Amino acid sequence: ALYKHYKNKRDIFNCIFEYVCRLDVERSRKSGVPEQDYSDMPEAFSHVSAKSLGNYMKEQFRYWSEDEIACNFRKMLTLEQYKSPEMSALYQKVLVSGPLEYIENLLCEMSKEQEKLLPSPHALAIEFYSPFYLLLSMSDGTDCKETKEEIAQRYMRYIDDFFQKYFS
């Protein structure tokens, strides 16, 4: 039935990818973080607060763990990364190195405002983003709504603790 509306599997994938990207831009704007990469809008990265980044990441976690389309897209992309270099590059851009670089650039700008000595922006970004990915995987591993909510709450607390530790 889907092929009545789409040419092929790739067309379906591209439409889902565009949808996911569009929602990401909306969440970025709503949270007050840049909706593009640092290279496209470096000035916007210098005006992001810890609260804005924290809220954005909490929204991202909810989205990637609760939205059925996003969950299925992420799982499909995870499998497809092993089938072609193009899908591997997209997986990295969407779920691994892309978010890590984005967060590193934000934390680099935020670190400039801090008086205390902080780890490198790269080390901070790894510390900040790793629990996102780990807890997302844990959420994938259960069908129990209560367990999923406990995992989400752990992530929310982690974000608050991270900013308390480094940016308070």
Give the residues covered by each predicted segment.
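Helix-turn-helix
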Residues: 1-19
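Amphipathic alpha-helical segments that line or abut small-molecule/effector binding pockets
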Residues: 43-66, 71-79, 122, 126, ...
